[in-house]
Amino acid sequence: MRRGAIGIYRIFAGSDGASHIEELRLEEHPELGALTNIHEVRVQQFDGTRKRDFNPLPERRLIIHLSGEVEIGTSDDSRHVFRAGDIRLMEDVTGRGHTHVDRSPSSAVYVILKD
């Protein structure tokens, strides 16, 4: 995956229930630049100790990383580190889900999306 000025990544469950990560280009997904289906927005800080095994999320969310590093793992055992400036569109609300490991204290904006 390339590292540009803004990295936008989608984490989703495939038809087989396995989780996957794909990079999105904002110019190909303009809807990400003007979200109107927002349920809640919150800013959160974490102390760097979260470590979760595979789990799906309870709702779709967009996560905008402000500081720190977070590692997300998918069903095929690939891992991706997200840093300040990266954006994750989390859509793996079914299936096996993903793993999560804080690599440092971090902060992020959580945008909870309506379906």
What does each model-found stretch correspond to?
Residues 1-46:
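A short, N-terminal "cap"/entry segment at the start of jelly-roll beta-barrel domains
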Residues 3-5, 55-56, 73, 93:
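Short solvent-exposed loop/turn micro-motifs enriched in small/polar/acidic residues
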Residues 14-15, 66, 75, 104:
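Short, ordered coil/turn segments that flank beta-strands lining enzyme active or ligand-binding pockets
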Residues 26-29, 37-57, 80, 91-95, ...:
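Conserved short histidine dyad/triad with adjacent acidic residue
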Residues 39, 75-86, 92-115:
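Ligand-binding loop in jelly-roll beta-barrel domains
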Residues 44, 64, 72, 110-111:
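Preference for bulky hydrophobic residues occupying beta-strand positions
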Residues 55-56, 62-84:
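A short beta-strand-loop-beta hairpin characteristic of the jelly-roll/cupin
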